[in-house]
Amino acid sequence: MTEWITAPGLTDYQEALAFMEARAAAIAAGEAGELVWLVEHPPLYTAGTSAKAADLLEARFPVHAVGRGGQYTYHGPGQRVVYVMLDLNRRGRDVRAFVKALENWVIDALAEFNLRGEIRDGRVGVWIARPDKAPLPDGSMREDKIAAIGVKLRRWVSFHGIAINVEPDLNHYAGIVPCGISGHGVTSLVDMGLPVGMDDLDLALRRSFARNFPPLAG
């Protein structure tokens, strides 16, 4: 059975990296079980393996270069970071299917708050259509990102994971081009007018987890 841990307070990012790497290695060695780790971080930016220097507009907070996929993203208070240390040796060695399952998991959790999350080809993460905002210059509808996804696999065990905006300071995103995508914005559950707290989201994530990541046999 997949273990769940919720970290109290704000978790130092480098300590989180060290913990994830150690746990992923233990899972790969058969010495530990899968883990979903729920944390919040102090304000910081992370740069994934595809990050472009031009997308760091202003280093307002510490910048951490990390080995996960993706580009620049922001972490900070009011954002639920979901670190997923799952064994793809047992769940299927299919990276695309794994990322799709992560996206669907977030979409299922958001649906509990009657919020429709969507995915877009070429734009990993979960998006919210914003017909209430002015359209883009080409006439297409604006979309705001509510959840970013970036994972790394080592010996087919995942780490890093998902960042879902509950009530972060969205102005903190101004220092980067989030995930290298300009033209679209970012939003949060509270920004969408939902009176949702971190505990509410955590419960929704727990309820929807098994639908996307069935329990392992044995």
Swiss-Prot record:
One of its GO terms (molecular function) is lipoyl(octanoyl) transferase activity. Its EC number is 2.3.1.181. It holds the Pfam family LplA-B_cat. One of its GO terms (cellular component) is cytoplasm. CDD domains: LipB. The active site is at C179. One of its GO terms (biological process) is protein modification process. The record marks K145 as: Lowers pKa of active site Cys. It catalyses: octanoyl-[ACP] + L-lysyl-[protein] = N(6)-octanoyl-L-lysyl-[protein] + holo-[ACP] + H(+). Keywords: Acyltransferase, Cytoplasm, Transferase. It is an enzyme of class 2 (transferase). It is found in: Cytoplasm. Pathway: Protein modification; protein lipoylation via endogenous pathway; protein N(6)-(lipoyl)lysine from octanoyl-[acyl-carrier-protein]: step 1/2. Residues 30-217 form the BPL/LPL catalytic domain. Substrate binds at R68, G69, G70, Q71, Y72, T73, Y74, H75, A148, I149, G150, G161, I162, A163. Signal peptide: none annotated. In the reaction, the free carboxyl group of octanoic acid is attached via an amide linkage to the epsilon-amino group of a specific lysine residue of lipoyl domains of lipoate-dependent enzymes. PANTHER family: LIPOYLTRANSFERASE 2, MITOCHONDRIAL-RELATED, OCTANOYLTRANSFERASE. Belongs to the LipB family. Catalyzes the transfer of endogenously produced octanoic acid from octanoyl-acyl-carrier-protein onto the lipoyl domains of lipoate-dependent enzymes. Lipoyl-ACP can also act as a substrate although octanoyl-ACP is likely to be the physiological substrate. This is Octanoyltransferase. It comes from Paracoccus denitrificans (strain Pd 1222). The gene is lipB.
